[in-house]
Amino acid sequence: MDDFPSLNVSDLESKLLDYNIRDYEVQNSKHKNNIAGNEKESIDQLSLLNQVCSLKNRKAIDSTKNSPLFYQNVLLSKLACSKILCHATKGGNIEVMGMLLGNVIGNTFVIFDCFELPVEGTETMVNAHMESYEYMVQFYHEMVERSYTRNEENLNIIGWYHSHPGYDCWLSNIDMQTQSLNQQHQDPYLAIVVDPHKSKNDQKVRIGSFRTYQDQNDDTNFYELNTTVFDSELNKLENPLSVKIPFNSIESRNLESNYLQKLSETVKQWRNFKIMEKIENTAHTEDTTTNKSISTPGRIIQTAHEFAFAATSNGNGSRVNIMRSNSVSSIGSSSDIEMEDRNCSAFDSVASSINTIADPSRTSSIHTQMNNQNNQQERNSPKRPHILPAIQSSRYGVIFEGKDRPENKNFNIRTASAQDAFESKCIDDFHESLKNDYLTQKEILLRLKLRQYYRLRMYRDMFSK
């Protein structure tokens, strides 16, 4: 410590973020909110870390011969901690391995970054073979030395890390042999162990730093170093990560619910339209067998009125048939004339629903009495409710609104060819509108689902194996 009179290790630790790694929780949202508030603190930390890097030409005192437990502290950057945890999580139940980059000052390891190492691992063991060491040397020469030399920084390989999936952080016998061998040839050297499964279950990073030593019986043992996480300039790579991939699950669910409701309403309207069309086709077939020519578009509109009125009448009053004859009004009946309940006079035709032309002097009193009776019954009968305007601004219901609604009680749809053509066009427009609404809302729902899938896939690839 005599070579570093201007720098005290205890002061170095007190100026950095002082909290134990076992209590460190990964909270991206909290980190985003505190970026602006911690800007000044990060600048102070950066200047302090630059002071550490400026000691690159000085070698740490080799006090391990006098004190095997000389190294006691580890300063781990948030970037290196996140990369170690992500690599271990991707490995799942298989152990993974990587190298640590940083410097040593006094009895403290300062780790700035790390990189993965391609090795063959099992559930309980991981070893680096010759190919792995060749990759490590080439990666360090091509990526680490050139990158950090441009920034006037010098990062060395000062240790290794590996995972213990599910069985806590410690050094096994093989781990102790590997660490002891590295300490003999390239000390100072550090070993970090992380447990991804317990980190995920406890929502806390379970990580530990270890070194080995020889006890009095010349047996190899290990001890744990105090580990502290600090912030550095290298964490700028983390900040955009939490901003570029937000997951607005609540907003997506609200949009999905709204469009799903609209899609359901469109399908219901389409179903009602098909039911009315089927009823009209059935009625048209029956009328064709009785030699009655009826236009389909007008009957669809009429059937819509009758279908809705039958559902809402509840038995109060009788329904007046629009398709009635000019001779006798039929009330409460589906036929034009009730032949069994009426005694036909000599002036009425049994085979036809149209009155025969008779001598006015002989039939005037009879017809006057019948017309008065029919008019009184029509005035007392309930009026037909207007059903189609339930679809506001619909394309075929508007023809019966206001002044466009036919007021003539004897209005016959069969004779209104121009009206039928207009109704047919309105029905086609309504059919096309329902189809377009269905396709549009379906496409929007699919896009929302795909967007949600892409976000979940990205999160799965980043934080799971």
From Swiss-Prot:
Short motif (JAMM motif): ranges: 162-175
Chief place where the protein resides: cytoplasm
Annotated compartments: Cytoplasm; Nucleus
Alphabetical list of PROSITE patterns matching this protein: MPN
GO cellular component, one term: COP9 signalosome
EC number: 3.4.-.-
A Gene Ontology molecular function term of the record: metalloendopeptidase activity
Renumbered residue ranges of the record's region Disordered: 364-386
Domain MPN residues, every copy: 74-216
Biological-process GO terms, alphabetical: cellular response to pheromone; conjugation with cellular fusion; positive regulation of ergosterol biosynthetic process; protein deneddylation; proteolysis
Quaternary structure and interacting proteins, as annotated: Component of the COP9 signalosome (CSN) complex.
Family: Belongs to the peptidase M67A family. CSN5 subfamily.
Free-text comment on this protein's domains from its UniProt entry: The JAMM motif is essential for the protease activity of the CSN complex resulting in deneddylation of cullins. It constitutes the catalytic center of the complex.
Name assigned to this protein: COP9 signalosome complex subunit 5
Species this protein is from: Candida glabrata (strain ATCC 2001 / BCRC 20586 / JCM 3761 / NBRC 0622 / NRRL Y-65 / CBS 138) (Yeast)
Lineage: Eukaryota, Fungi, Dikarya, Ascomycota, Saccharomycotina
